[in-house]
């Protein structure tokens, strides 16, 4: 990022075409094209550059949702950011994008209770086994890794205990065993921690919390590196887990004061 985090937040998302400080809210389920040639050309562009904001149906997004994705991708310093209707939707998308029946995942014990319910109960129905590790004793993480382990899911700090983990050590273990990693970074946000830059494959933030800042919108973001992009992209298109334009606009608005609010929180 060429500008500072704070400067970027204050000067992003402006609509220079209409000379407006804020971007317009574009609501569209159906996209208009001039001809069949035009739609085929757009579809070809989307296939060649799936992060480029090319869409032929509202479920794939509009210019309003794309603006938010571009902002968050810059903030996360990631390959791409997917936005979901809720923060937990991003958790679901991350896990289901990279796991299949017969796989195992290892999860930090003090995770957000819906995440625990998903991993401990719901995944069983898909023959995906979850093992929990003690964040204060990473030996429990290492010893539970098997040939079936596909993902290590971290929460830092923990939702229930607010404990901080040795992220570099976790990443070292994962890379040595060639296991994918995901982190719920809702408390930290990329203002304090950039997990993709650190080495994580996926980073989740509940946009409902600090991003929006006004308790009037639900949303989530899932930042990814290039390695897992295709898996998440395909899962997102199949499941339809995408944030709508109105919520995208409200989160974009809230981001302008993210640094001010978090600085005050951390005093």
Predicted regions and their residues:
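Residue-level marker of positions within ordered structural domains that often coincide
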Residues: 32, 77, 225
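Conserved N-terminal alpha-helix of the aminotransferase class I/II PLP-enzyme fold
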Residues: 35-89, 117-121
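A generic structural signal for short, solvent-exposed coil/turn residues
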Residues: 2, 19, 49, 75, ...
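Conserved PLP-enzyme active-site core in the AAT-like
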Residues: 6-13, 80-267
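N-terminal glycine-rich, Lys/His-bearing helix-loop that initiates the first secondary-structure elements
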Residues: 1-52
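Alpha-helix initiation/capping motif
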Residues: 16-18, 57, 61, 134, ...
């Amino acid at each position: 990022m060429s500008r500072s985090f704070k400067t970027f937040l204050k000067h992003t998302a402006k609509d220079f075409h209409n000379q407006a400080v804020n971007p317009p809210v574009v609501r569209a389920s159906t996209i208009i094209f001039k001809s069949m040639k035009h739609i085929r050309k757009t579809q070809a562009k989307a296939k060649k550059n799936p992060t480029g904001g090319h869409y032929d149906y509202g479920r794939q997004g509009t210019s309003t949702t794309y603006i938010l994705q571009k902002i968050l991708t810059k903030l996360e310093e990631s390959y791409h950011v997917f936005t979901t209707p809720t923060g937990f939707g991003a958790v679901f998308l991350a896990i289901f994008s990279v796991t299949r029946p017969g796989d195992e995942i290892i999860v930090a014990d003090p995770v957000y209770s819906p995440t625990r319910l998903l991993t401990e109960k719901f995944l069983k129905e898909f023959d995906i086994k979850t093992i929990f590790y003690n964040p204060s004793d990473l030996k429990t993480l290492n010893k539970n890794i098997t040939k079936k382990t596909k993902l290590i899911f971290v929460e830092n700090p923990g939702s229930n205990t607010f404990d901080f983990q040795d992220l570099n050590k976790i990443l070292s273990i994962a890379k040595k065993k060639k296991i994918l990693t995901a982190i719920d970074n809702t408390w930290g946000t990329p203002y304090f921690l950039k997990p993709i830059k650190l080495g994580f494959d996926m980073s989740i933030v509940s946009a409902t919390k600090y991003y929006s800042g006004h308790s009037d919108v639900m949303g989530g973001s899932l930042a990814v590196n290039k390695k897992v992009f295709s898996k998440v992209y395909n899962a997102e298109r199949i499941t339809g887990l995408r944030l709508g334009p109105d919520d995208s606009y409200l989160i974009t608005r809230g981001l302008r004061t993210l640094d001010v609010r978090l600085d005050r929180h951390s005093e």
